[in-house]
Design a protein with these regions (language model features):
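Formylglycine-dependent sulfatase
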Residues: 1-229
């Protein structure tokens, strides 16, 4: 995807979770066609780099995470992971606005992945239960996406920007049966594992408040975006 977009004249940027390989540097975002990267190559690397002894399971995942920029070393960042990533995405929008080239930002938040660790300002709105923490993390995702959309609006980028919001899989049943009424969960091939929302916003191109019942696959994204550029 980034190679195709760069070939069409776009600058390409990845913010957040990578999760597409980290043992070999050839699998890292910069080597895979992104002009910039800020985030983490694997969820366990939020706790620090792997060693022969493993990694520190006791270190928090979401709080004061260890993150990487481009091909650089891990650096500790202060705050909640979601806040740090959305601030990076917003800062990036400010930079690409000033350039003449079109741009692509791949913003992969980690929420609401386990461990269930919402920021305090969201956790305080819900009961201190697995369900409450999960709902707080969903609210935190909504707030982060809302900030990105508001930045696009304020920067006069909304009309020319296609926004796609999607999840990679259904919820895990490790903590709560979050996929009801669908059967199954993450790591299964039933609806509970595969059926996720797909939201798209592109004013003057995609009509508002339209629900489409057709099945969409991740395999559709590449040819669809390729046809648009």
């Amino acid at each position: 995807m980034p190679d195709m977009l760069r070939g069409a004249g776009y600058t390409t940027h990845h913010v957040g979770k990578w999760h597409l390989g980290y043992v070999s540097e050839q699998a890292w975002p910069i080597q895979q066609g992104f002009d910039s990267f800020f985030g983490f190559l694997d969820q366990f690397l939020l706790r620090g780099p792997h060693t022969d002894a493993g990694y520190n399971l006791k270190r928090p995942t979401y709080v004061n995470p260890l993150l990487q920029r481009d091909n650089g070393a891990f650096e500790k960042h202060t705050g909640h992971l979601s806040d740090i990533l959305v601030e990076e995405a917003i800062d990036l929008l400010g930079r690409v606005k000033e350039q003449e080239q079109p741009w692509f930002i791949n913003y992969w938040t980690y929420l609401p992945h386990t461990p269930l660790t919402p920021a305090t300002r969201f956790a305080s709105k819900f009961p201190d239960t697995p369900e409450g923490k999960y709902n707080a993390m969903l609210m935190q995702v909504d707030a982060a996406v809302g900030r990105v959309l508001a930045t696009l609006d304020a920067s006069d980028l909304t009309r020319s920007t296609l926004v796609i919001v999607v999840s990679d899989n259904g919820g895990t049943e490790k903590h709560l049966p979050s996929n009801q009424p669908f059967i199954g969960a993450k790591n299964t091939f039933t609806e509970g594992g595969l059926r996720t929302p797909l939201l798209m916003r592109w004013p003057e191109v995609i009509p508002k408040n339209v629900v489409i019942d057709e099945t969409v696959s991740y395999l559709d994204y590449f040819p669809t975006l390729e046809s648009l550029v």
